[in-house]
UniProtKB/Swiss-Prot annotation:
Stated name of the protein: Triosephosphate isomerase
Assigned GO CC terms: cytosol
HAMAP family: TIM_B
InterPro entries in the record: Aldolase_TIM, TIM_sf, TrioseP_Isoase_bac/euk, Triosephosphate_isomerase, Triosephosphate_isomerase_AS
Active site: H95, E167
Annotated function: Involved in the gluconeogenesis. Catalyzes stereospecifically the conversion of dihydroxyacetone phosphate (DHAP) to D-glyceraldehyde-3-phosphate (G3P).
Compartment list: Cytoplasm
Species assigned in the record: Lactobacillus johnsonii (strain CNCM I-12250 / La1 / NCC 533)
Superkingdom field: Bacteria
Gene name, Swiss-Prot/TrEMBL: tpiA
Subunit structure: Homodimer.
Keywords assigned: Cytoplasm, Gluconeogenesis, Glycolysis, Isomerase
GO MF entries: triose-phosphate isomerase activity
Family matches, as PANTHER family: TRIOSEPHOSPHATE ISOMERASE
Amino acid sequence: MRTPIIAGNWKLHMNPEQTIEFVNAVKGKLPDPSKVESVIAAPAVDLYVLKKTAEGSNLHTGAENAYFEVEGAFTGETSPKVLNEMGIDYCIIGHSERRGYFHETDEDINKKAKALFANGVTPIICCGESLETREANKQDEWVVAQIKAALDGLTAEQVSKLVIAYEPIWAIGTGKTASADQAEEMCKTIRETVKDLYNEETAENVRIQYGGSVKPANVKELMSKPDIDGGLVGGASLDPESFLALVNYQD
């Protein structure tokens, strides 16, 4: 059985003081991690206090990006090795904002996935199509190509442990949500792609999230779908009550 995973992606929000307040507000009210895994991915400047404040609670921690080199003359980057030393569990890579604003390529994302695994951090690999790709009805081939490129050279064992987040770019921060059926259809396509690349067992183990205007009002319906194992949540993860409503969707 795949354990559901709800991960908040704070993007460029929250300072260390706000992070401490947020974690203190949620940490006693999170579900048992065997029922639902609760994750907050925060800006690098907040990670130390996020981890420290979350200690002893059911809150898992994530970074929003990392580089594929562990150290050296790479001004402004985040080391996957240091994330591991800090005890950070997850790292989001390949988010559409990173691909769009910062021109990250599929090759960069593949290198990052390998670097994270080499340093004991679990990647959350994002994929998803733009509005024009969907309107041209090319979303399947687009996302399949992203998955193939991102997973290139990873072992079946690695892939069964990572998380894939499907985030249709047209539904991020636009208030438009893919219908639960549209989301399920793409998450199923992703699972079938993993099966084609590896095997059925790997495809059954990999957790696939939907990301794109996930909120308390639609989380139950999305999570009822067989191939959706979680949510990668933006705005709705910034408020403690809203985040708690998401992770406790089973109640």
